[in-house]
Regions:
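Extended terminal accessory/targeting regions
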Residues: 1-121
Length: 121
């Protein structure tokens, strides 16, 4: 579960991105804590343009989960598969509907490989 709120500011250096103004803290079901540092830049939900009306880049219940997931992919200290599992757990923790959480989870499983550990979102 998240133990902090998502506090962001628009990143004027990169189009369509935000910067964390404060750390974002996640604690998993085993008590492991992951801290996304203040200053981390992310681009929200990376979805194809055709789906952006259904899943906007920003503004959903999934915002904290997408920031966490982008950080996990950039940091690379968890495997891609484990990063995606944390993403799904974070989505459900923030009350994202089961169907939407599954769609987002499978989207990162299918299309996320090229972004893992590269910081290219």
């Amino acid at each position: 579960m998240f133990t902090s709120e998502l506090i962001i500011k628009r990143n004027i250096k990169e189009k369509n991105s935000y910067e964390l103004a404060a750390p974002l803290i996640w604690q998993d079901s085993l008590g492991v804590i992951i801290t996304v540092p203040a200053g981390f830049v992310y681009d929200g939900a990376s979805v194809p343009r055709v789906l952006s009306s259904i899943v906007p880049r920003f503004g959903g219940r999934y915002d904290r989960a997408t920031a966490l997931h982008d950080y996990l992919y950039t940091a690379g200290f968890l495997s891609r598969k484990d990063s995606d599992k944390v993403f799904y757990e974070a989505l459900r923790s923030d009350k994202v509907r089961w169907v939407q959480a599954r769609v987002l989870y499978y989207a990162v499983r299918i299309f996320g490989k090229k972004h893992y550990k590269k910081g290219e979102f």
